[in-house]
Regions:
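A generic structural motif
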Residues: 86-88, 165, 183
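Active-site-proximal loop/helix of nucleotide/amide-processing enzymes and allied scaffolds
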Residues: 22-112, 117-119, 125-156, 199-262
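Bacterial N-terminal signal peptides
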Residues: 6-16
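Sec/Tat signal peptide C-region and signal peptidase I cleavage site
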Residues: 17-21
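Hydrophobic, aromatic-enriched interface-forming segments
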Residues: 140-181
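Positively charged n-region of N-terminal signal peptides that target proteins for export
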Residues: 1-5
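A short, well-structured beta->alpha microelement
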Residues: 189-203
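A short, surface-exposed beta-strand/turn
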Residues: 95-111, 172-190
Length: 262
């Protein structure tokens, strides 16, 4: 790939820090394995995001009673991604699944069902709901819609992501996202890492025939999994170049990452 390709006109300056304010740095000897992990998590985020999109569409199509429902939670199963819509009991000691959206013949096709009476939520769903509530409460109020996602982390911990949602079908936001690492029971925040600060909404002008996008990481020297999510979601599908302190990276349209300049 050549950086001389036509690039998106606007550069995004991205600031990354952890809860302790540390700069994200990866040694060159660990870089290949780290980038493979970013790709894996980014692809999983994309799959989660797609399941949430199509699963919630199916959910709202049956005109549900949303009173008391908490967050949607996507779960990867042998049959594909499923989306649960739980709620707490009045005493907040049991989590019940009131609705569920399941795959129906393809990744974009879901069928929603209502459980009457609601089903008891398994322990892993309870932990994920607690983790979401903890992260959302810490994140606070945003001035635009946000999506959430939950992925497995090392040592049984949970990654909870909050990232800006699309508000227009042809505009893709990048930035303003946070990743929390939360204990396996969903009760303790172990790390809060802001992946990007600035939010920019990218809209492509077909007259420009843009071949790739570009943004710069100022306080991080590696791509983030939400960068991969951005590339996999954006239409038209084009690569994204990321300028960091020591390297220039290319995120390809399949989510893989390569170093294009050292």
């Amino acid at each position: 790939m050549r950086i001389s390709l036509a690039l998106a006109a606007t550069c995004l300056f991205v600031f990354t820090n952890s809860l302790a304010g540390q700069i994200r740095h990866v040694d060159d000897k660990d870089l290949a394995a780290y980038l493979a992990g970013v790709t894996e998590r980014g692809r999983a985020l994309y799959a989660y995001d797609q399941a949430a999109w199509h699963g919630t569409d199916a959910f709202f199509a049956i005109h549900p009673d949303t009173n008391g429902l908490t967050h949607y939670i996507c779960m990867k199963t042998a049959a594909g991604w499923e989306v649960a819509f739980p709620k707490w009991t009045e005493t907040h000691d049991r989590l019940l699944v009131a609705y569920e959206a399941k795959p129906a013949g393809g990744p974009e096709n879901f069928t929603a069902v209502k459980y009457d009476p609601p089903r008891e939520g398994p322990d892993d769903l309870v932990a994920k709901e607690r983790a979401l509530e903890l992260a959302v409460g810490d994140f606070g109020t945003a001035n635009r819609p946000y999506n959430t996602a939950i992925l497995p982390a090392e040592d049984g911990n949970l990654y909870v992501y909050l990232y800006p949602a699309q508000t227009k079908s042809d505009v893709w936001p990048l930035g303003g996202d946070v990743r929390y690492t939360i204990s396996p029971d969903g009760k303790q925040i172990l790390e809060k890492r802001q992946l990007h600060k600035t939010i920019l909404d990218f809209q492509f002008d077909p007259k420009l025939k843009t071949a790739a996008g570009f943004h710069t990481h100022v306080l991080s020297d590696v791509p983030e999994e939400t960068d991969v999510l951005y590339v996999l979601t954006r239409k038209p599908s084009i690569p994204e170049y990321i300028g960091a302190a020591r390297h220039v990276f290319a995120i390809n349209t399949d989510g893989s990452i390569q170093v294009v300049k050292k």
